[in-house]
């Protein structure tokens, strides 16, 4: 659910070739002459989620916005934030949750 939103958040800081490679692995439309943009990866992930039956929003799976603070605190404690291509603060994570809500 969060991955397309996170891809959008990271698109300016991430390695575009990594995004292009991932897009090529999951897209049915990847061609040699494609003019790839990182937005295409986020769109493709959303389509893949749909095909797999993954609901599109946090609210669809029963997450309520009053949980965002604790979720963001937990995310900041995980080791994943340090690996993120875009510098990320708790407020950024809260915005991502709101976008995915």
Residues covered by each model-derived region:
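Gly/Pro-rich interdomain helix-loop hinge
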Residues: 1-67
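Short, amphipathic C-terminal "tail helix"
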Residues: 64-101
